[in-house]
């Protein structure tokens, strides 16, 4: 009888793995060129990565990422901030800069905005600073 292969234990949750995948895709766009198209997709993906990282911390904190009145939907980035700060006591001092990024994302998504490379550089600098800190201090990853 053949022995079944042992599967490696999951090192990252699917939510966290997805956050890193979309972050990687955003960074590929950012470093590929400084066209408005690449800046647009860089910011969309990096903002999504941040939202997923926040949701992962909510999950790790033992809270549901699903809306209480509609379990088919997950909480928004704003819902994640609220749970983190009010229920889990997690400080997010970078929130004002991350709010600007999310506003830029909304402008891209809903108003057809095209960010320039200077604005994208501002958002990427602050986003990456947050991600480095948050992944290390809140998600306990190197």
Identify what each model region corresponds to.
Residues 26-34, 60, 108, 112-115:
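Secondary-structure edge/capping motif, primarily at the C-terminal ends of alpha-helices
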Residues 54-99, 103-104, 131:
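Flexible secondary-structure boundary motifs
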Residues 33-40, 63-68, 117:
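Short, surface-exposed loop/turn segments at secondary-structure junctions
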Residues 21, 41-48, 122, 126:
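Amphipathic alpha-helical interaction segments
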Residues 22-25, 45, 52, 100, ...:
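Amphipathic, well-ordered alpha-helical segments in soluble domains
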Residues 39-59:
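Short, hydrophobic, well-ordered secondary-structure elements
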Residues 1-42, 139-142:
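Charged alpha-helical initiation segments
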């Amino acid at each position: 009888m053949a022995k079944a292969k042992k599967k490696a234990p999951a090192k990252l949750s699917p939510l966290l793995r997805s956050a890193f995948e979309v972050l990687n895709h955003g960074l590929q766009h950012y470093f590929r060129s400084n066209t408005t198209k690449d800046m647009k997709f860089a910011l969309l993906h990096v903002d999504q990565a941040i939202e997923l990282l926040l949701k992962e911390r909510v999950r790790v904190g033992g809270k549901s990422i699903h809306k209480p009145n509609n379990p088919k939907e997950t909480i928004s980035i704003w819902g994640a901030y609220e749970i983190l700060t009010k229920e889990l006591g997690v400080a997010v001092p970078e929130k004002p800069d991350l709010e600007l990024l999310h506003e830029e994302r909304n402008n891209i998504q809903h108003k057809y905005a095209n960010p320039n490379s200077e604005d994208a550089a501002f958002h990427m600098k602050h986003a990456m600073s947050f991600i480095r800190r948050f992944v290390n201090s809140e998600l306990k990853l190197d």
